[in-house]
């Protein structure tokens, strides 16, 4: 707990309301200053601490994380860091899994930000939506069967991510169903 907790949360909610297109010029300039253009880091890191993730995780903790467990851990002599790693993180796995799936899908389908950050003409530094767009807009390549096959194959990583992370969601639902 800290004094301006609610103010900080309100600022995070206000940031959620600002469209990405409004801040994109500043974001690209900042990434250029950090020499991170033409890398994938500006596409990965912002989704970890996105305002929607903070909002969802806070809501999940307030509704599903009993503070009695933290107090019991403190009484047992467990430090804050160990309480976080041993108790909070395992209880938060369903929410972390949901946010990981949402962040992965949003990043995977994002066209706008990679189109500004990955500015080299090298085709090795493109995301899948950029490649599909290049295929669809090409005058020389009009094999629509291959284009639609590429689009269909682009779903496979999303399915793999869901299959790998869904067990945490199911375990969380089962854990939440057991009440005293």
Regions found by a protein language model. Give the residues of each.
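A structural signal for multi-pass alpha-helical bundles of membrane permease subunits
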Residues: 1-180
